[in-house]
Design a protein with these regions (language model features):
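P-loop NTPase Walker
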Residues: 1-5, 9-25, 29, 40, ...
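Extended, charged low-complexity regulatory segments
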Residues: 1-182, 186-191
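Conserved ATP-dependent motor core of P-loop NTPases, especially the RecA-like helicase ATPase domain
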Residues: 196-199, 205, 232-234, 246-415
Length: 620
């Protein structure tokens, strides 16, 4: 048996041990879950609540353990003392709590990504392990300490490489699931992945520099490192297409994370289906930042004094609607700084009070409260008054407002006066036309200014009341059991009752337009317009972003060709950082050099890419 085969056999033993432990933990979690479920619904409320809590915990554990089946182990670190540390997708220990596998996101795994021959600490060798299902099919070593005895061993074993493991992994046959991204990270990517949560990190890189790997790894790493902060808010990943999002859905679970919402710009608003596309010039016009002003103008125009004011008949008295009353009610409603539909409640309330006071002025006696209540009821039921109040402060939906804006040229002229006639002709379309992808940020802008549908507000209030009732019930049961100050809190029990794990958090976030995320990852970000960015920042007020793209590849007319020109107005000059990936592992040196020469001659943006040494071509 060759030395290389012996290395494979040695690693197979370690990998098999890790999988055996994984199987044992799965069986243990399954057994405990079955025991809890077998208890049924018997017992006191406290006992049932605790069973629900434990059942959810075991279900979550099973989901986590199942998600890391593929390529459980992918690396090993050897230190100066001769100890081995295996790196994988999850942390595992044996029954005596001795470590078997180190989670790739733990600090102990950092050298696997960051160590270099010039800065390796106590690590002397890094080994990359390749699996096919549960079988070890390849190992490659990087000796980080040239004075180590392991240099000769790795050379004689046929496992020694320089950057060969990374190059081999990146040049290997690529699959739709991109499932080998963990083992391809190198130092410059790792620093980006582990950057602080509360900032905007822009990753600029040309083709083949691993931008997408950085984006997905950063999402998984942040979910792991900041899981308390992100468990209830979640992470949003915005990609260029549904195909890309399918990749994400396949890759992130294999990293041990599932609580991520993945969307394109087109399907970011729940209930809105936008499949049509504008021509490039129309899309550019709709993507300009000043279109937010057009939407604001369209909303403000629906807060006005109608030209005709009726006289309302109440209990035999003619009570006229007075212009000054409407103007005052509009001013008071605007001062609330509430969205249009919410502020309308203040406007209507003030107008009803004003009309009641006008009625009282016509009386020669002091009315009883019962009469005043009756007058208010009559006012609420009066058709003429209701129509006039609607004309003065029209309740609207975002869909209706945007549809009207592009169906009537006079509205575009009025609300977007900077548009030229040819621009207006480009944007016009028949009323009721399907919404386009470029409409989605405008719809979101309108919905933000208008506020939620009153019916949706009522539903949310009912849900909040139900949750408060459940939490009170949990507190009462804990108090009765005498464990109110123990390790299980009422909040934990309510969360488990409602299944508020990461996956359900993602489901709730995806269904709520007003949900604010703890972090947003954007791939192919150079294609986004200013209005796209407004929509995304609205969903992450903390401005915690990972932004990935290549401004040299921008194809959209409304996209960005300068990160600074786009990012400074959004985040502020000092609140975002630009990181450039400089290693190209995909393209041969000759191809990349030719592309660089052409870009320079044409005055195009040029990434500072260090091109790796050529490797043996892989034919697929």
């Amino acid at each position: 048996m060759s030395s290389y085969s012996a290395q494979l056999r040695e690693e197979q033993q370690a990998v098999s041990r890790a999988y055996d432990r994984l199987d044992a933990l799965r069986a243990q979690a399954r057994s405990r879950l079955d025991t809890v479920r077998a208890a049924g619904s018997h017992g006191s409320p406290t006992q049932r609540t605790e069973r629900d809590s434990f059942a959810t915990m075991y279900e979550d554990r099973l989901t986590q353990l199942r998600a890391v089946e593929d390529r459980l182990v992918f690396g090993r670190l050897d230190d100066v003392h001769g100890a081995h540390r295996y790196i994988g997708r999850i942390g595992l220990s044996d029954e005596d709590h001795e470590p078997i596998l180190t989670d790739w996101r733990a600090d102990a795994a950092r050298p696997f990504y960051e160590a270099t021959p010039s800065n390796h600490g106590d690590i002397v060798m890094r080994r990359h392990i390749t699996l096919s299902f549960r079988e070890v099919v390849g190992v490659e070593d990087e000796v980080l300490d040239v004075h180590s005895d392991q240099v000769g061993e790795a050379s004689s074993n046929g496992t020694l490489t320089g950057e060969g493991a990374l190059l081999a992994s990146l040049n290997a046959k690529r699959t739709g699931k991109m499932t080998d991204i963990v083992a391809t990270i190198q130092g410059e990517q790792d620093r980006i992945i582990r950057a602080d949560l509360n900032q905007a990190v822009v990753v600029q890189g040309g083709p083949g520099t691993g931008k997408t790997a950085v984006a997905l790894h950063r999402a998984a790493y942040l979910l792991y490192t900041h899981r308390r902060a992100l468990q209830r808010s979640g992470v949003l990943v915005v990609g260029p297409s549904s195909t890309f999002l399918h990749y994400i859905d396949q890759v992130l679970p294999s990293l041990g994370e599932t609580g991520v919402v993945s969307r394109t710009i087109a399907d970011l608003i729940p209930g809105i289906i936008a499949t049509a596309h504008d021509d490039p010039y129309a899309a550019k016009l709709k993507g300009e930042r000043r279109m937010a002003k057009a939407i604001a103008n369209a909303v403000a125009a629906r807060e006005r004094v109608p030209s005709h004011l009726p006289v309302i008949r109440i209990n035999g008295f003619n009570v006229p609607m007075v212009r000054a009353d409407i103007e005052q009610a509009i001013a008071d409603a605007k001062r609330t700084r509430q969205p249009h539909n919410k502020a309308r409640e203040t406007f209507v309330r003030d107008m009803l009070s004003a009309m009641r006071n006008r009625y009282v002025e016509r009386l020669d006696y002091e009315p009883e409260q019962a009469e005043l209540n009756d007058v208010m009821q009559q006012l609420r039921m009066n058709d003429d008054l209701r129509k006039t109040l609607n004309l003065a402060w029209l309740p609207m939906t975002g869909e209706w407002l945007v549809d009207q804006l592009f169906a009537k040229p006079q509205q575009l002229r009025r609300f977007a006066p900077w548009l030229e006639e040819r621009d207006i002709e480009t944007l016009m379309r028949p009323k009721g036309s399907p919404f386009t992808v470029s409409d989605v940020p405008l719809l979101d802008e309108a919905m933000e200014l208008l506020g939620p549908d009153p019916k949706a507000v009522a539903r949310q209030k009912a849900l909040d009341a139900k949750r408060a009732e459940e939490e009170q019930f949990a507190k009462d049961t804990l108090a009765q059991a005498g464990i109110g100050s123990g390790i299980v809190t009422s909040q934990m029990l309510v969360d488990n009752i409602n299944g508020m794990d990461a996956e359900l958090t993602a489901q709730r976030a995806a269904a709520d337009r007003e949900w604010t995320y703890g972090h947003i990852v954007v791939d192919e970000a150079q294609e986004l317009t200013a209005m796209d960015w407004r929509m995304l920042i609205r969903r992450c007020p903390s401005r915690s972003f990972t932004i990935v793209g290549d401004v040299a590849q921008t194809s959209a007319l409304g996209g960005t060709r300068s990160w600074r020109r786009m990012m400074d107005p959004l985040f502020g000059e000092r609140n975002w950082q630009l990181n450039e990936l400089t290693i190209n592992y995909r393209n041969p040196k000759e191809v990349s050099q030719l592309a660089s020469d052409f870009a320079s001659s044409e005055g195009l943006y040029l990434s500072l890419i260090h091109i790796s040494e050529p490797t043996r071509p892989l034919y697929i």
